[in-house]
Amino acid sequence: MSILFISGTGTDVGKTIATAALASAFHHRGDRVIPVKPVQTGEPDGRGDIHTVEKLSGIRGVEFTRYPDPLAPNLAARRAGLPQVTLPDLAREIRDLDAPDRIVLVEGAGGVLVRLADDLTLLDVAAELDAPLVLVTSLGLGSLNAAELSVQAARTAGVEVLGLIGGSASPDPGLAEQLNHGELTRICRVPLLGVLPAGAGDLLPDDFQAMAQSCLTLPL
């Protein structure tokens, strides 16, 4: 049915929590959803982003490749002496999960230009699959520049950006965070699909899923 990529303006902006929230909201709408993490780095077995998504959303996910060190995937593969991922393999594995009645949510590693392999980024994979992107961004100082650069990079690569999700929003936002909501949509020329509260990842699954339904506008 649809393949949707989720990336961020950087590390620790709330990308995994946003992926779990999207999975929950799509599932609540009645869609079949499968979250995918093509490359995981720096987590022991039994832990990692896809496990967080599964715990919060209650939806089983898939992880393709894992490297031991907490580095960009190409560096982690090189340091471990393991093969780097390739565009043909990633595209095939993601296509194999796609089905007419299913939404495949593909969570990247770090930002849009983080190298999955020496000459491969998440944007390359999205472009190969002709799949759109949702960008997760911080909301405080520095967010505007990072978000606009990320959206520009996606568009240059031929990847459509369907919208932004604000991650880890403070319960007591400062002036910059308050004003950046509107400014992000203006400069990036895409809608703000929702804002997820700080600490959302600590919620119990039922509470998390209710939060996701109330906080997000689905992009598809």
From Swiss-Prot:
Substrate binds at residue 41. InterPro entries: DTB_synth_BioD, P-loop_NTPase. ATP binds at residues 12-17, 49, 107-110, 167-168, 197-199. Its cofactor is Mg(2+). GO terms for biological process: biotin biosynthetic process. One of its GO terms (molecular function) is dethiobiotin synthase activity. It catalyses: (7R,8S)-7,8-diammoniononanoate + CO2 + ATP = (4R,5S)-dethiobiotin + ADP + phosphate + 3 H(+). Gene3D superfamilies: P-loop containing nucleotide triphosphate hydrolases (3.40.50.300). GO terms for cellular component: cytosol. Keywords: ATP-binding, Biotin biosynthesis, Cytoplasm, Ligase, Magnesium, Metal-binding, Nucleotide-binding. Mg(2+) binds at residues 16, 49, 107. Its EC number is 6.3.3.3. Homodimer. Belongs to the dethiobiotin synthetase family. This is ATP-dependent dethiobiotin synthetase BioD. It comes from Corynebacterium efficiens (strain DSM 44549 / YS-314 / AJ 12310 / JCM 11189 / NBRC 100395). The gene is bioD.
